[in-house]
């Protein structure tokens, strides 16, 4: 099973995260299938590869709660409903 989850990057006390599609059995810093976004909680910046995220969601990938909140804040689910209708 594939999940969309955060992968920690950055320096000590200055964490930034990549949003990645990764196998559920892999560890947090393990090998990812594809990088689909970027999230910086300190600067509150988000960069998303929307077509890649929609592709993985359509294939059955489950976002973690934090990634789900990031995607909802970016109004990605409204866009997904608009594309599917």
UniProtKB/Swiss-Prot annotation:
One GO term describing the cellular component: chloroplast
Keyword terms, alphabetized: Chloroplast, Plastid, Ribonucleoprotein, Ribosomal protein
SUPFAM superfamilies associated with the record: Ribosomal protein S16 (SSF54565)
GO MF annotations, alphabetized: structural constituent of ribosome
Pfam families for this protein: Ribosomal_S16
PROSITE patterns: RIBOSOMAL_S16
One GO BP annotation of this record: mitochondrial translation
Subcellular localization: Plastid, Chloroplast
InterPro entries: Ribosomal_bS16, Ribosomal_bS16_CS, Ribosomal_bS16_dom_sf
Domain of life, per lineage: Eukaryota
PANTHER family in the record: 30S RIBOSOMAL PROTEIN S16 (PTHR12919), SMALL RIBOSOMAL SUBUNIT PROTEIN BS16M (PTHR12919:SF20)
Family membership noted in the UniProt record: Belongs to the bacterial ribosomal protein bS16 family.
The protein, known as: Small ribosomal subunit protein bS16c
Provenance organism: Agrostis stolonifera (Creeping bentgrass)
Lineage of producing organism: Eukaryota, Viridiplantae, Streptophyta, Embryophyta, Tracheophyta
Encoding gene per record: rps16
């Amino acid at each position: 099973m594939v999940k969309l989850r955060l992968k920690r990057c950055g320096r000590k006390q200055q964490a930034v995260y990549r949003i990645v599609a990764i196998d559920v059995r892999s560890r947090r810093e393990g090998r990812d299938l594809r990088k689909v976004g970027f999230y910086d909680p300190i600067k509150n910046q988000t960069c998303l590869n929307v077509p890649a995220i929609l592709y993985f969601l359509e294939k059955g990938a489950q976002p973690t709660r934090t990634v789900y909140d990031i995607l909802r804040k970016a109004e990605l689910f409204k866009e997904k409903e608009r594309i599917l209708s």
